[in-house]
Amino acid sequence: MSYYWVALVLFTAQAFSIEGDRSASYQEKCISRRLINHYQLNKEIFGVGMCDGNNENEFRQKRRIVPTFQGNPRPRGELLASKFHVNSYNFEQTNSLVGLVNKIAQEYLNKCPPVIYYDSFVEKSDGLILENLFKTIPITFYHGEINADYEAKNKRFTSHIDCNCKSYILFLSDPLMTRKILGPQTESRVVLVSRSTQWRLRDFLSSELSSNIVNLLVIGESLMADPMRERPYVLYTHKLYADGLGSNTPVVLTSWIKGALSRPHINLFPSKFQFGFAGHRFQISAANQPPFIFRIRTLDSSGMGQLRWDGVEFRLLTMISKRLNFSIDITETPTRSNTRGVVDTIQEQIIERTVDIGMSGIYITQERLMDSAMSVGHSPDCAAFITLASKALPKYRAIMGPFQWPVWVALICVYLGGIFPIVFTDRLTLSHLMGNWGEVENMFWYVFGMFTNAFSFTGKYSWSNTRKNSTRLLIGAYWLFTIIITSCYTGSIIAFVTLPAFPDTVDSVLDLLGLFFRVGTLNNGGWETWFQNSTHIPTSRLYKKMEFVGSVDEGIGNVTQSFFWNYAFLGSKAQLEYLVQSNFSDENISRRSALHLSEECFALFQIGFLFPRESVYKIKIDSMILLAQQSGLIAKINNEVSWVMQRSSSGRLLQASSSNSLREIIQEERQLTTADTEGMFLLMALGYFLGATALVSEIVGGITNKCRQIIKRSRKSAASSWSSASSGSMLRTNAEQLSHDKRKANRREAAEVAQKMSFGMRELNLTRATLREIYGSYGAPETDHGQLDIVHTEFPNSSAKLNNIEDEESREALESLQRLDEFMDQMDNDGNPSSHTFRIDN
């Protein structure tokens, strides 16, 4: 109770004191009227009304001081900021945004220097943001202004002038103009800072305008009811292909407030298409291009035509579609009149964006990358030549086949040139060879017999019986040389006949230029221009004589039907190999010929899918192709296609001829066939042909000579008749008439004897004259050999002349010639009708 009484006493005392203060009055000085008017003070507050007369400035009322604050008083800093129209909250928001942008630039954009774009509205209203950002950004950057039409004043920033990547930071009042400024961005990271509302930002992220900007981060300010508090910044991105229609949905990542992220573990640029394409259906244009795309037409049970596809690219894309959760709708590429090839038509469809993907074994080239995009190469291919090659050299070439033509030339020079040193060492002179072709012929047959072992010379006058050591050494060297050569020759013939000999094939550009081939290629698909400006000299020479055809079948037809000039066709090696395997066999072409693909690649290419430019699904499909290559799935697909589509009816894989496949022949022991020995028969047939030709020429020559004699005789008889008629007035005497008849009979008799003389007798007379020329000089003086055909020179038969001949062989030769002359005289007497006497029986 004592506590209550004490409190009551204190409260009563305080109440009385307050009442006393109110009743007490004190005099204060009044404020002058000049100060009140100058500072516009309240006259009622500053006590002007209480001052009267001359003492108006002597009293004023002091302001009552209350120690307890009531309400929410503003700090002095805020009061000063309001007086100078400075918003401290906006200043803090600016610093917060600058800190957020600096954090994003340092953590996500440091590898790719950012390009900062800002429009005129942001520059004028939020100029303090740009100023602070340019001063504090920790990495290298570019910046440029956007004009009123939302176009960058410096457009070079958006083009890649080098291989370095770029990123973008945009300060825009209208987020819908982002793609107009930057265009599609599938790889670069884009940060958009906008003052628009959250609803407008969500509309932008859901629209088609943001579908081509893959790595997009949008920063929007969250509006609150109390504008004096710090407002957070919300960070958005979008999810591409959220459903089967390919639409986008906005995604909230995190927020930024008080210098930190609410969820700092979140990646601000997450990977897209982690769950695929949500069953989206891609439109694909394809054309038949084996072995990459097979177009197979079949009939179902009802008789309706069915079209199905197969091949390396089809199976690869089907595998990727299952992994990325999308479906494909393949349509056959239509034929257009304004395009020259199927690939050009597919590229036009891609540029027009009527299809999403194009596949037809398309080569990745610089020209196609200018108007469209292509995937990474999934299969290698090369441009190769196809020619008509022989499986083996013909067997009739076995005679000349063992040696090349330089060896044959060297052998001919050695053996024909060996005539002169052998003759000179044996006779120590070459005078008897000059003009005597018979002796040269004998020596030729001698060296031919040495080489072929077909003849043996054991006569007294053969070189093998010579007594001179130099001749024997020379013949011995030729004999050793001949043994080695004949051994090589016979062994090579055996190998050539029993084993196949493969001819040279065309495997390079130099082979085509050296063998004078006609070369052709396609006039569409880029083949007509790819090698036009080549700096390779052989390629430029080859392109100058290039012929262009409309299809691959036409080119292969030119190869198989080439007759006088060989033809080579340049095309895809994979396609040519399949066409040869499926359409051409040994029976279709020849038993000895085959279509050959060059081993050397004329140009190496990579095959890929065709996409529209800046397509967002290209990067994901490229990553799957690289993964399939790394894991060996593409090699597995190639083997499966080869097994299913390129298998013969017997179960074996079809083989196209190449240098290796031509040589992959199982060798086995076998007997020689007629085809193996046809060279011998052809050689014999050649001999018969030459003999028949000589016989025909002799018959024609004999008939011609006979006709000439008849014509000459008729002319002489006509001339004699004319002379007799002209001299008919002059009569011959009996002696003159008898002499005239005798000469006439002798001429007729000589003509009949010459006609009866056979070919062998004439050659025997020629041989006798030749022997006289060779051996007659040893025992007889120089005689006129020009008269040998008229008068037979008598050889010396006395013992005195024979003693003058020292050489025994020469004496034997002269005796043989003498006996030959006697025999010839006897033959002449037998053929002379005047030597016989005919009696008439009475």
Swiss-Prot record:
Topology in membrane: Multi-pass membrane protein
Summary of the tissues where the protein is detected: Expressed in the dorsal organ cool cells. In the antenna, expressed in approximately six neurons in the arista as well as five to ten neurons near the third chamber of the sacculus.
Region Disordered: start-end pairs: 722-745
Subcellular location: Cell membrane
Stored InterPro entries: Insect_Ionotropic_Sensory_Rcpt, Iontro_rcpt_C
Any one Gene Ontology BP term: synaptic transmission, glutamatergic
Glycosylation sites: N325, N469, N533, N558, N583, N588, N765, N797
Record's signal peptide: 1-15
Keyword Glycoprotein among UniProt keywords: yes
Keywords per UniProt: Behavior, Cell membrane, Glycoprotein, Ion channel, Ion transport, Ligand-gated ion channel, Membrane, Receptor, Signal, Transmembrane, Transmembrane helix, Transport
Effects seen without this gene: Strong disruption of larval thermotaxis when exposed to a thermal gradient ranging from 13.5 to 21.5 degrees Celsius with mutants unable to navigate away from cooler temperatures and toward warmer temperatures. Reduced response of dorsal organ cool cells to cooling. No effect on humidity preference.
Bilayer-spanning residue ranges: 405-425, 437-457, 479-499, 680-700
Gene Ontology MF annotations: glutamate receptor activity; ligand-gated monoatomic ion channel activity; transmitter-gated monoatomic ion channel activity involved in regulation of postsynaptic membrane potential
GO cellular component: membrane; plasma membrane; postsynaptic density membrane
Similarity-based family: Belongs to the glutamate-gated ion channel (TC 1.A.10.1) family.
Task of the protein: Integral part of a neural sensory system in the antenna that provides the neural basis for the response to environmental changes in temperature (thermosensation). Together with Ir25a and Ir93a, mediates the response of the dorsal organ cool cells, a trio of cool-responsive neurons, to cooling and is required for cool avoidance behavior.
Protein name: Ionotropic receptor 21a
